[in-house]
Amino acid sequence: MSTTSLQQFATATSFSPFSNSQSARMSQSQSQTIGLDTLAEGSQYVLEQLQLSREGGNSENNSTFKPSSVRDSLAEARSMIRKNSSSAPVRRRISRACDQCNQLRTKCDGQNPCAHCIEFGLTCEYARERKKRGKASKKDIAAAAAAAGHQGGMGNRSPTDRRLSQEPGGRYDSVLEASRVQSHLPANGLSSIHNTQAAHSQPPLGSALDALHLNHFTQLNESGRSQMPVSDLRSLQILHNNPRSPSALPHGLNAYNDNTFSLLNSQEPNTTSLNHFRLGNSTDNPSAQFLGLSPPAQSPGWLPLPSPSPANFPSFPMAPFSGTSLRYPVLQPVLPHIASIIPQSLACDLLDLYFTSSSSSHLSPQSPYVVGYIFRKQSFLHPTKPRVCSPGLLASMLWVGAQTSDAPFLTSPPSARGRVCQKLLELTIGLLRPLIHGPALGEASPNYAANMVINGVALGGFGVSMDQLGAQSTATGAVDDVATYVHLATVVSASEYKAASMRWWTAAWSLARELKLGRELPPNASQPGQDGERENEGDNPSKRNQSLHGGNSNVNVTEEEREERRRLWWLLYATDRHLALCYNRPLTLLDKECSQLLQPMNDDLWQAGDFPAATYRAVGPPIECTGHSMFGYFLPLMTILGGIIDLQQAREHPRYGLTFRSGPDLDQYIMAITQQLDAYGQSLKDFEARYINSLALAENEPPENPHIDHLSPSGRSSSTVGSRVNESIVHTKMVVAYGTHIMHVLYVLLAGKWDPINLLEDHDMWISSESFLAAMSHAVGAAEAAADILEYDPDLSFMPFFFGIYLLQGSFLLLLAADKLQGDANPSVVRACETIVRAHEACVVTLNTEYQRTFRKVMRSALAQVRGRVPDDFGEQQQRRREVLSLYRWTGDGTGLALS
């Protein structure tokens, strides 16, 4: 009886035990190579598979010898290799690779620890069982089979096996007996098995599927398992473990019983489940229950299994976790999906980077793609009881962190970052399943995915009100989806594909409006005291996550969850107004939708879990500076900008614009917005005086028990206190400088023109009006504030995502003055132009975008003319500047920075 290697059995025999024809084997061996592109580059798997398939085909024709032609061709090829490689140094091949290199399919030097594990900080070990290549000896196989036959028998068969063998219709198949013999083989004999299927004829497909038994996979070793397409088995795991799944399978598969899925049943004894797939340095992976959360990439068309939605993720309970195997257990749901992308330790580092602050005095995200903190750091990084998160949100956070991380895994080779980021992006989108959001837990139909198609509406998406699906009882899962959209949209907006980012922003705004994030949730049935217990609710995961497991609308919502909803809405509210200016579009989220929503709380209090009483907090869109974070100083400016954008849209209206511009309401509108800007300017001065004076007092007399100190060490010296106070003072002045600059730009937008071409052409002689002089004074004031910004933040890393458009719009008037006045320009205008050029150069270094590079060249050309260096082709220079600026239009049909 001929034998084959274990790899051939796993690929060609395991999934077709009822096939014995050579053509069927060849077609199957070809189909198994479809997924080879997912292996690491440079893998030897393809060569081994090709050689094994040839040996397997030859052994079927003649088990005692190989054809002479094949032997001759192989000998000739080997001799040619020896001839060509005689001059090259001999490369010694290691006997075995470490477990990490074997799993990641990377080259290993065989040392302990190896160079690869040392470079990336992985745990290097050689715990895998040693295997021998080639066929096992017939003596060993015969001895193992005799021992198995002596120990086995009908008495040792499981009740399921006896029932299968006695079923009417002769459903017994030799594959069952072969798998039973294999399960009793010793470990060293698993590398080769009997190919008993070759002697049997092929039964009909239906009966073969009915008789198919997967127990012979349960004893496969790790090297054999690596060749199985695990993604094709995930849907079976969902079907087997989900209690809401239909009891009857599709037609033709009704003969499957419980033992059929014994590979995926972690509760069955003596069964090797998917937990045996090792992730990182974990010895016992508790995340295998999440392997079925992602729909299979190539699922068969005859198995219409329901795909799980992100709202169903919390229904999988977290397994007990050892604190030594994973630094942040919050990553458990996403670990199975990223195991082949990044190491476990790097995933923890990227999550750390997401929450890293660039300042030790006040929270300020270090990543340019984290525009504001929506979640509490302690809730995510809790060592034992973290916040329950959807895998899509976690993948997007890792993707954001990977954009700027300096980890060696992402910087060597140079193409590594792009490859990893692309895989994380695809994973995030796949886990998010855009525009399809599942119903509440306990209310989902077993064939939910099929109903979405049959009924013709996107249930749980944008076709049905979320209230009808009980979304408020699972608000956290839906909030995770909105936050994932925000991460995707933010990174795309900062790239050169700004127009494409509007798809993600629109999805985030629409879902936030459906979830009614702009409204306060009703109070809980048994509301706790405003003080006391609520302070500790943020650190009690059972309270924090209890809304994920309820099936009705009476589930209590913790104060942390309420604040997450508020902060997410206000972040979307601010970006809506910011992007309306960037892309010359009307507003999406209205002030009326959030007129009764509490304003976001102070970031330091938020991260510390100190939730103030709701009765002492303001509601509605703010217009005054209240803090150091984006919600404190930038959100009020965006509230005022929303009114300016509405005014500009009315001015540019194709039918009513002329009437509005000549009517009496325009002046009243401008006066109301001017009063709001004046109020913000006064609040900015009060904010600076209040914080700097209090910090000066704190420097002279350090507090004995500081209430908020999220980054300080346990022991504090006077020098440490002094440095922290100085840093806090600088941080406050930097916030004031940014707020002052944007405030002056809003004055310019209120009084002036937005489009640079209309500004330079000046057909209506606006340059000689009083409003131009007022706007010009604010443009110079914005440039002076930009000089202060460069002093406190030389690389403009404090808010690079938002700052670029305000720097650009505040520079158009200076460009006009330089273009018209040339050598007669006021010295203050010249200094302002020089400051703008420096600021754009810093912006290009921090967050490089095309419009900033373009405008820097335009301003340099105009500044050279102001200094008296007028070129011979002066007219051509002016025309070239206008051609460049014509790409970015803020006219009625212009798209601003979004190039089409």
Swiss-Prot record:
Query: What function does the entry list?
Result: Transcriptional activator of the xylanolytic system. Involved in the regulation of extracellular cellulolytic and xylanolytic genes and in the regulation of the intracellular activities of D-xylose catabolic genes in the pentose catabolic pathway (PCP) in response to the presence of D-xylose. Binds to the DNA sequence 5'-GGNTAAA-3'.
- Tell me, using the record's free text, what induces this protein: Expressed in presence of xylose. Repressed in presence of glucose through the action of the creA transcription repressor.
Phenotype reported upon loss of the gene: Reduces growth on birchwod xylan, while growth is unaffected on D-xylose, xylitol and other carbon sources like D-glucose, L-arabinose or L-arabitol.
Q: Name one GO biological process term.
A: DNA-templated transcription
For bias type Low complexity, the affected ranges are 712-722
Cysteine pairs forming cystine bridges in this chain are none
User: Which CDD domains has this protein been placed in?
Assistant: fungal_TF_MHR (cd12148), GAL4 (cd00067)
Q: Name one GO cellular component term.
A: nucleus
Q: Identify this protein by name.
A: Xylanolytic transcriptional activator xlnR
Q: Where in the cell is it found?
A: Nucleus
Q: Which Pfam families match?
A: Fungal_trans (PF04082), Zn_clus (PF00172)
Q: Which family does it belong to?
A: Belongs to the xlnR/xlr1 family.
Q: Do you know which SMART domains this protein is assigned to?
A: Fungal_trans, GAL4
One GO term in the molecular function aspect is: DNA-binding transcription factor activity, RNA polymerase II-specific
| PROSITE patterns membership | ZN2_CY6_FUNGAL_2 (PS50048)
- Renumbered to this chain, region (Disordered) spans 53-75, 137-169, 520-559, 701-722
| DNA-binding region extent | 98-124
Q: Which organism is it from?
A: Emericella nidulans (strain FGSC A4 / ATCC 38163 / CBS 112.46 / NRRL 194 / M139) (Aspergillus nidulans)
Report biased composition (Polar residues) as residue ranges: 53-71, 543-557
**The entry's keywords:** Activator, DNA-binding, Metal-binding, Nucleus, Transcription, Transcription regulation, Zinc
Q: List, as start-end ranges, the regions of compositional bias called Basic and acidic residues.
A: 531-542
